Amino acid sequence: VVALGVTETDVHFQKADTRYTHIYIIDIELNEPGVSLEVGMPYDADVRNNFQRQTLTEMADYADRPWHRVAAMINADFWDVSTMDIRGPIHRNGVILKNSFIFKESLPQQALSFIALTKDNKMVIADSVEYRGMQYNLKEVTGSGVIVLRDGEISGATYPGIDPRTCLGYSDDGHVYFMVVDGRVEFYSYGLTYTEMGSIRKALGCSWAVNLDGGGSTQMLIRHPIADIFQIRNRPSDGQERPVVNAWMVTVNEP
């Protein structure tokens, strides 16, 4: 238990093809009093352009304060490594910071969809074409990639690659699940395909789940429940924390 309404589970298993896989899952009870789901940004700042990057640990340090304690975070959207442009829209606390998608044919798994928390505290995962008609009812938003579970149906088979993954999903009973899958490390964790991620999310009871930025960006942070420090739970494939452009974080109303 990371905090009331926030639980972490680590799963390490060997698949039928003998490849090892290590998964970290955060279960968030969205309807638990004092638990909030938010978009994290570098320096906890509402930025509309000239985007910057920070590690999750640095983002957590800036966002954390009494009665707004960061309990867990995962990395979120993709970005252009040369221009720092974020691929999808960004909303924070109802403020629209960016309301467009940057899709490139050379990067067909990015800028396809978005994740949102509505102003009445409901989760949404939807295709990018649906964003315009919904944007003014959305409180927290980031862009996302391939939808791996669509209304209970596993999807994403078009892209068979095995990689480190970051995934966010939700169930119809008010639970949100952060999941990261380590990869590219032989005998520890190879990673997963989109179809495998969708299967795991469905087994967890999710109805919708979507891929976020993966590879070396795949990272999960928690506030250690005993030591009261921020800790990266997985093993980033870069060998260290990679600074990222935004994150999904869960905060709790604790002193």
Predicted segments, located by residue:
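Conserved beta-alpha junction segments in alpha/beta enzyme cores
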Residues: 12-14, 21-25, 143-173
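Zymogen propeptides
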Residues: 1-107, 113
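Structural recognition of the beta-strand scaffold that forms the well-ordered cores
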Residues: 71-75, 114-116, 123-126, 167-169, ...
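A short, polar/proline- and glycine-enriched secondary-structure boundary/capping micro-motif
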Residues: 47-51, 134-139, 187-193
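Conserved, well-ordered active-site substructure
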Residues: 83-107, 154-208, 217-255
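Short, solvent-exposed aromatic-acidic interface loops
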Residues: 40-48, 129-134, 181-185
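Active-site-adjacent helix-turn-beta-strand microarchitecture at beta-sheet edges
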Residues: 75-160
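Beta-strand-turn-beta hairpins that frame and shape the catalytic cleft
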Residues: 21, 31-34, 120-122, 170-177
